[in-house]
Structure formats: C-alpha cells, structure tokens
Amino acid sequence: VLGSRGLGDVYKRQHILWTLAIVAGVSVANLYYNQPLLNIMRHELEVSEFKTNLIAMITQIGYALGLLFIVPLGDLYRRKNIILTNFFLLIFSLLAIAMAPNIYIIWAASLITGICSMIPQIFVPIASQFSRPENKGRNVGVVISGLLTGILASRVVSGFVGEVLGWREMYFIAAGMMLLCAIVVLKVLPDIQPTFQGKYSGLMKSLFSLVREYPSLRIYSIRAGLAFGSFLAMWSCLAFKMGEAPFHASSD
C-alpha cells in the first residue's frame, strides 16, 4: 500500500494505487487505438496509405513532446490539476477525431491526443513518491503493469470495436472513458503540492544536464527509442498488409 509521508492516511488506501494503475492503462490506450483502424480509416477517408500512416506517427510525436515538455510540469504545478486539464483536452481531441471530415483535422487532433496522453508518466512518480521504501518498487511496478496492459489491450479493443461498430465509434467511446477517468481522478487522487521551487526554464535545463552528465542515460534512451520505434513501425504497417491478399483480414 501507499505510504502517507505526512500527507494523510488517504495514501495508505490500496485502492488509490490500483486506481492509478487502471487509469494509466485506459489513458495510454489513446495512443494505440488508431493502429488496427488505419486501413478502415483509409478507405472511408479515401486517402493514401502514407497519409493514413501519418496518424500513428503524429500521435507518437505528440506523446514525445508531452513527455519532454508537460511531464516536468508535475514538479512545478499541482499534479492533479495537470492531470485533469489533460483529460479534458483529451476529450476534446478524441471527439474531434471521431467527427473529423478529413485527414487533416485527424492529424491535428492526433497531435493533441499524443501530447495529453502522457498522463500515466505523471502517475509513476506519484506512486513512487508516496510509497514506503520497502513498497516503492512494487507500487511502481503495479502502475507500470497497468500502463503496459493498456498498450497491449488497446489494439484488441479498437480492432474489435472498429469491425463491429466503426472507427469513429471507437473514438466516441474513448472520449467517454476519458470523462469517466477525469471524474475518478477528481474524486480519488489527493491534491499533491509541487516540490520544485524554481522556474520552468530551470527545470528544463536540469533535464538536459542529466542527459549531458550521464552517458548511460543517453545509451538507454537511444536503445529504448529504437526498440519501441521498431515495435510501433511493425504495428502501423500490419493493418494495411493484413488487409491485402492473401489474408484479407478485418480490423479485429
């Protein structure tokens, strides 16, 4: 269970930890709903495979921007407010994708979706910060497990919903789930005070200082980026290839 560390007994309740894990999985799924749906979207929007595949790429670019520029704000401002703001922006962007008349609006909304889907990366330090030393590794592992489950389950869910209901309906459902997550976070997550006393510019400089001072960090970052990039490239192309002969597979 989460430790209090002086912020009240609420952090001792195990349901907060599981709430973080579940909401992390549900929110990170927004990054991957599009991958099994790309071929369906291409046919409806009547665009090329290249333009359709940019949806997945732009979403991931947005996610990288969110990790770099938004996640550090958790040390500067109240994390609960940051999380709720991003949830409501996600609702807007997911609805925009669901109702988009053309590929260009989907690109713009996908960028916003990617930026705002970095929410689970704010949950991870929350679980670590308010854990007793003997429980810290386990609690962080629970949240990470929820995140990875969301990454894997998102493709199964979106493929099935896309085939049965349609790709637009998947994004309507996703927007509804973000509203539900926002309500849960509002009710369950305690208000956490920021720990950094400086300015945003100083916070960003400290990030680049870490990269400069620790060569192993650079190596691990490059390795992780290449590995996950390969993984995403495979999934993005798979929807188109599986829809062709001799497979003729649907999104599910």
Protein language model regions, located:
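Pair of pore-lining "gating" transmembrane helices in MFS-fold secondary transporters
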Residues: 13-33, 111, 213-233
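Extracytoplasmic
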Residues: 19-49, 120, 234-239
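Juxtamembrane intracellular "pre-TM" segments in multi-pass secondary transporters
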Residues: 9, 190-221
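Residue-level signature of mid-helix packing/kink "hotspots" within the transmembrane helices
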Residues: 32, 60-68, 118, 151-152
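Conserved MFS/SLC helix-loop-helix module at the cytosolic interface between two early adjacent transmembrane helices
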Residues: 65-103
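Cytoplasmic helix-loop-helix junction between adjacent transmembrane helices
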Residues: 109-145
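Single conserved hydrophobic/aromatic residue that forms the stacking wall/gate
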Residues: 1-11
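Helix-loop-helix hairpin linking two adjacent transmembrane segments in secondary transporters
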Residues: 105, 142-187
